């Protein structure tokens, strides 16, 4: 059913058949931007029992109450059920088929915590696992792997990535972990084995949320960024660093996030790591409302970042010479970019 955040009432469709995602895709492409659909796979509500009860009767959580687990007042789909994982994968497939999106991105929420009440599912499906933690990680791994395979079967050009919490595991917990201590280890806290996703090549890119400053005593930004750079090395998986723009601009001169100094130092460090392909900034509104950050990014990314890139979807009447040297025959040694392929198809239909 339709989200309440679109029309104010869950299950109520926008007027006149308006499809907001189709509109966003159209406008993004017109500006030369890619649009990646952001998916939060297992979370149903964050507003407690009242929000859950307000869900419409045709919501999957109401149609399949056996899929639902309550945890600390909020409600989640149970990752340990094969039918839940299949439902999420089919949702991603619908996005890939129905919309001209450029990618699908999974958020960092998988299991909400170790006290998740999934004992019955573990008893039914956990045979072959020595502990519930390994079984939970395998459930998430199955979703990550299968979802990528299925959307790439529909559109091999889709970019598929995930933004896990910045620390996979401390070295004191796992020998392959980072030299960090005492923080949130996603391997254990949300059962997200993000290192495995990279090493197995199940995703196209990883975007760890490294929301700490350089010099943090237990989770130093530089330490974590270098760990991720080393992790992706040689895998073919791209690395984009999730930046904490929302913390920048603190008015307290004693704060490590005072002004834009912390972000500036992080960008400089990223530039020294060849594996870092770029940054993702959380979040746009806070960045747009911070003139100092905007000025910093204009300098860091170049003035061209202030202007829309040329659209990948070309008006072929204005780009008659775009495909150079093509005589209508395609040879084994030839190759086409996505934009060229779209342009050629457009020529066949006008």
Task: Give the location of each predicted region.
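The substrate-binding groove and active-site-proximal loops of carbohydrate-active enzymes
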Residues: 3-17, 71-86, 128-140, 182-183, ...
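Active-site-adjacent "subsite" loops/lids of carbohydrate-active enzymes
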Residues: 25-26, 36-98, 188-192
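Aromatic-lined carbohydrate-recognition surfaces of secreted/lumenal glycan-active proteins
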Residues: 34-46, 105-108, 134-187, 237-248
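Aromatic- and acidic-residue-enriched segments that line the glycan-binding/catalytic groove
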Residues: 1-12, 43-72, 109-128, 173-183
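Aromatic-lined substrate-binding rim segments of carbohydrate-active enzymes
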Residues: 1-40, 124-154, 220
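Substrate-binding cleft of secreted/luminal carbohydrate-active enzymes
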Residues: 191-217, 228-313
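Extracytoplasmic Gram-positive cell-surface binding/anchoring modules and repeats
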Residues: 314-349
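Substrate-binding cleft/loops of secretory-pathway carbohydrate-active enzymes
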Residues: 47, 154, 159-207, 212-227, ...
């Amino acid at each position: 059913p339709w989200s309440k955040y679109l029309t104010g009432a869950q299950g109520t469709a926008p007027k006149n058949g308006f499809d907001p995602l189709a509109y966003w895709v159209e406008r993004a492409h017109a500006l030369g931007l890619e649009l990646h659909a952001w998916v939060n796979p297992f979370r149903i509500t964050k507003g407690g029992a009242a929000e859950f009860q307000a869900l419409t009767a045709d919501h999957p959580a109401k149609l399949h109450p056996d899929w639902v687990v309550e945890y600390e007042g909020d409600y989640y789909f149970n990752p340990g059920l094969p039918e839940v994982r299949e439902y999420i994968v089919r949702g991603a497939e619908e996005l890939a088929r129905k919309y001209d999106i450029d990618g699908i991105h999974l958020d960092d929420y998988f299991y909400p915590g170790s006290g998740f009440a999934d004992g019955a599912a573990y008893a039914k499906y956990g045979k072959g696992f020595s502990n519930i933690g390994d079984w939970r990680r395998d459930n998430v791994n199955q979703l990550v792997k299968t979802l990528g395979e299925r959307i790439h079967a529909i559109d091999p050009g889709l970019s598929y990535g995930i933004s896990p919490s910045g620390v996979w595991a401390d070295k004191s917990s796992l020998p392959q972990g980072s030299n960090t201590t005492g923080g949130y280890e996603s391997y254990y806290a949300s059962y997200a084995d993000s290192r495995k996703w990279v090493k197995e090549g199940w995703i196209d890119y990883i975007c760890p949320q490294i929301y700490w400053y350089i010099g943090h005593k237990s989770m130093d930004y530089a330490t974590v960024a270098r760990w991720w750079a080393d992790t992706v090395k040689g895998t073919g998986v791209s690395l984009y660093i999730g930046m904490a723009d929302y913390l920048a601009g603190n008015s307290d001169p004693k704060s490590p996030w005072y002004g834009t100094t912390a972000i500036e130092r992080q960008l400089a460090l990223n530039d020294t790591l060849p594996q870092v392909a770029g940054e993702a900034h959380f979040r746009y509104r806070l960045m747009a409302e911070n003139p100092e950050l905007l000025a910093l990014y204009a300098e860091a990314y170049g003035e061209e970042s202030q202007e829309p890139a040329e659209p990948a979807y070309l008006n072929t009447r204005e780009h008659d010479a775009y495909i150079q040297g093509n005589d209508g025959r395609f040879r084994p040694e030839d190759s086409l970019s996505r934009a060229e392929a779209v342009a050629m198809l457009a020529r066949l239909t006008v």
